[in-house]
Amino acid sequence: MARKCFFTGKGPMVGNNVSHANNKTKKRSLPNLRSIRLKLEDGTSVRVKVAASTLRTIKKYS
């Protein structure tokens, strides 16, 4: 489950670098992932990778 958000499923996207001469080469843009530790209701903690935008939402509602 590398390079993928645990909650939203956001993953790498593929696009093009376009030069002034209109030459196109492939590029990959990776999500801004952060590794966080979530505490579960039973007291244990789990380490998951989440996108930074998801982390903002988690902090907003917790």
From Swiss-Prot:
Keywords: Ribonucleoprotein, Ribosomal protein. GO terms for cellular component: ribonucleoprotein complex; ribosome. GO terms for molecular function: structural constituent of ribosome. One of its GO terms (biological process) is translation. InterPro entries: Bacterial_rp_bL28, Ribosomal_bL28, Ribosomal_bL28/bL31-like_sf, Ribosomal_bL28_bact-type, Ribosomal_bL28_sf. Pfam families: Ribosomal_L28 (PF00830). PANTHER family: 50S RIBOSOMAL PROTEIN L28, LARGE RIBOSOMAL SUBUNIT PROTEIN BL28A. Belongs to the bacterial ribosomal protein bL28 family. This is Large ribosomal subunit protein bL28. It comes from Helicobacter hepaticus (strain ATCC 51449 / 3B1). The lineage of its organism: Bacteria, Pseudomonadati, Campylobacterota, Epsilonproteobacteria, Campylobacterales.
